[in-house]
């Protein structure tokens, strides 16, 4: 190290003798490490990454090689002020050490050796107020902090956890979609033989909010086709994603996490934090400053900020990404009582990779789970390997996040005071409801991105007992007016070919009610007459027995936008 100092002095990096002598003394003192919250000097995956970040910044600011930077950092008696929260870090390490997450490897290489000893995981937690990284999980089992840090170094395909970042964020900001926009979730040919599938059954006509709740793939690809992968990549880069290939990743699969290189938990956490922080991306940091032995600050962490989307669209994105934690969603077990919780699951083919990314007003966290060798899946045949019956990444996320929120005041995100408006929306088309729309709900929009009025609706009177067109004999209290038809604007685009288009729940009904007939009405009239003799009474008894319907046909159900009539999805799925 002393030799390095001499070289630095020769190159003019140390300008005078006093500075040189002070540096020599610091070398003899050695490197000191201070936690920003506790002052402890224990070594963790967070600590290891902190030192790497300091070395990287020294290289950039002093324009020196990595070797020179390492020697300067390790041998100059520096004190590094870390952002680690010791309590949060300890909770991560405690959960990562549990054996239930260590699913043994099964596949062997040509030498008969296991490709993987057991599953692994990586996790990063960010404090939303400061955008400081407070904890890192780098491996399952024994904490080998000098090894590969899966929280910061691993890059893997993200699956559906990419949807809020690649589709919703840019889609809202570019006014391609709203929360109410409807697509036909049916098998679709996007060209070049690309026909993605859903992990669960296609839902037919479905809006964006519901798509995220149950993690439908096909509508998200349709969003990407109109938005374009190029535009999506622009936004992803603004959110701190550095591993994208402008050529290889510029395809529709980007919409559902199909990537050439993948993304690290650190960068996923940083990107999600931009949604939590009202649409502003702030680079996550591991240290705040570095001082020398004399107390002089020699390095301050770089923390650049970038406005990605408007405050209003960030609010809407949070609202949409909270759907998976609600009834019928894929991450209901991640909901934190008293906290507004947003969470999105992610899975790749055969569950090779499992993800859970999400946030509360306090923290943002991203967790990956899988095997180091990405050729070994977590789904074999009909068997899906899980932890406690859940997505293992989601179980890690849920257990840790719920614990670190204990004792914190209940909190929701702030709603912008301006720039938002509520409208009554037609559930069948996603347009602003008109007098012809009978199936409606209320949705929130930015003032510059409100849907057009619903078009193409007609109305007809339906018998609620038969579910068919009411005839002249249907009782008035059994007749209701419903809308039919309606234009789905996005499905008029010529950007894809929807195969076997879904049948709309609002299609016109042609069959006429056969339950209520003239004969029954005459019978009813007879019932209202006062019998004049015993024979007439007995005739009425017989008539009632023979003519009264024995069962009441089930009333037609109109799918509820909130998804309450949908079967809750198996939580082991995406």
Residue ranges, per PLM feature:
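Non-catalytic, structured segments within soluble enzyme domains
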Residues: 1-83, 90, 237, 241-243, ...
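Extracytoplasmic/secreted proteins, especially bacterial periplasmic and envelope-associated proteins
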Residues: 3-10, 22, 45-49, 53, ...
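Second-shell loop/turn segments in exported
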Residues: 4-5, 9, 33-39, 75-83, ...
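Conserved catalytic neighborhood of penicillin-recognizing serine enzymes
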Residues: 36-39, 176-232, 251, 281, ...
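A penicillin-recognizing enzyme superfamily signal
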Residues: 82-110, 123-127, 135-138, 142-157, ...
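Short active-site loop at a secondary-structure junction
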Residues: 119-120, 144-165, 174, 179-182, ...
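Mid-domain, small-residue-enriched loop/turn segments at the edges of structured enzyme/sensor domains
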Residues: 194-197, 228-270
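Intrinsically disordered, low-complexity repeat and linker tracts
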Residues: 299-301, 423, 460-465, 479-482, ...
